[in-house]
């Protein structure tokens, strides 16, 4: 298939283009501004990229046009050409959900903060466990060298963004991913350009919760009232909670599994991973800060979930 990516320079779109190339498709694309690291990644993948949005780049017509979100509204000359010519088109998030994720055990990392870090940690844990997960991350992790990979195992880690999908699909991107393991790291008011208030964001997260199967797993902080309010709207999936001790449960929290980190260094450079009252392992690393401990704990819980039961203890 010949696939053309409009807005290929964005982190999501450039990462998707690399996945499409790895699947064996003929991939080209265009954007107004292209710069590292995505420009370097696309060049390494030998993907041809055009400057600007000249409709002539779409002649002869590709089999499919994947339309990005950033800077591609109605009125863009390439977008108007796609519509007027009746070309087959879709959004980036929908393409991922339809052509990459089916048949995979999707581990999605959502929330206001820490998505890229947590998704990178989770992917690296699976990698170190001898697996070869697919992934799509909103950055270029140091240990993984690129932002996306098809992988050869059933597991696929995706950074799940709540921002809207495209000019023609105002649902949050993560609604296309259908995760079986879902991390919600935290939840605050964000994206004031599309969400009027926190409640509107919580509604999107509740829609996401409704898409997780009963045999999956939802992983949430034990001390985030905004996340607990979303769960309280209805959740049909087992829940594991995590936190840094001492842990108090949030408003409306149920009695799901509880994982917590017991720091053994003042700067959080070392901590024990505790499930119930039993220490599962100790983490010693070069990172500092309670926020990084929280991210790591969420990743560890996800890696130990039912879908990735081959992963060893922390």
Per-region residue spans from a language model:
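N-terminal leader/targeting and accessory segments in enzymes
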Residues: 1-95, 217, 225, 256, ...
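Short beta-strand "acidic-cap" motif of Rossmann-like dinucleotide-binding folds
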Residues: 26-31, 134-136, 241
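Flexible, glycine-rich phosphate/dinucleotide-binding loops
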Residues: 12, 36, 98, 142-143, ...
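Short secondary-structure transition/capping segments
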Residues: 40-43, 61-64, 101-105, 146-148, ...
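Short, flexible segments with low predicted structural confidence
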Residues: 12-14, 154, 173, 180, ...
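Phosphate-binding loop of NTP-binding sites
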Residues: 19-22, 57-58, 73-222, 226-238, ...
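Residue-level detector of alpha-helix initiation sites
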Residues: 10-12, 113-117, 293
């Amino acid at each position: 298939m010949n696939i053309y990516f409009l807005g290929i320079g964005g982190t999501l779109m450039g990462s998707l283009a690399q996945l499409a190339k790895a699947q064996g498709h003929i991939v080209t694309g265009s954007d107004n501004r292209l710069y590292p690291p995505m420009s370097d990644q696309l060049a390494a993948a030998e993907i041809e990229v055009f400057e600007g949005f000249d409709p002539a780049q779409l002649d002869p017509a590709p089999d499919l046009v994947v339309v990005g979100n950033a800077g591609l509204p109605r009125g863009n000359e390439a977008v108007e050409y796609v519509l007027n010519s009746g070309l087959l088109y879709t959004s980036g998030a929908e393409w991922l959900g339809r052509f990459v994720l089916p048949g995979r055990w999707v581990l999605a990392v959502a929330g206001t903060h820490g998505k890229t870090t947590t998704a990178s940690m989770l992917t690296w844990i699976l990698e170190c466990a001898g697996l070869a997960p697919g992934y799509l991350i909103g950055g270029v992790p140091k240990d993984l060298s690129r932002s996306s990979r098809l992988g050869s195992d059933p597991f696929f880690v995706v950074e799940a963004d709540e921002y809207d999908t495209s000019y023609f699909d105002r649902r949050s991107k993560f609604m296309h991913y259908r995760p079986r393991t879902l991390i919600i790291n935290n939840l605050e008011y964000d994206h004031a350009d599309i969400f009027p208030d926190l409640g509107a964001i919580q509604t999107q997260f509740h829609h996401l919760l409704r898409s997780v199967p009963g045999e999956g797993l939802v992983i949430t902080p034990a001390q985030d009232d905004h996340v607990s309010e979303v769960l309280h709207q209805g959740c049909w999936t087992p829940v594991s909670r995590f936190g840094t001790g001492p842990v108090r449960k949030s408003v409306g929290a149920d009695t799901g599994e509880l994982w917590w980190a017991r720091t053994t260094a003042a700067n959080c450079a070392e901590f024990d991973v505790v499930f119930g009252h039993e220490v599962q392992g100790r983490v010693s690393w070069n990172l500092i800060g309670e926020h990084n401990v929280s991210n790591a704990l969420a990743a560890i819980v996800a890696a130990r979930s039912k879908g990735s039961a081959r992963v060893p203890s922390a």
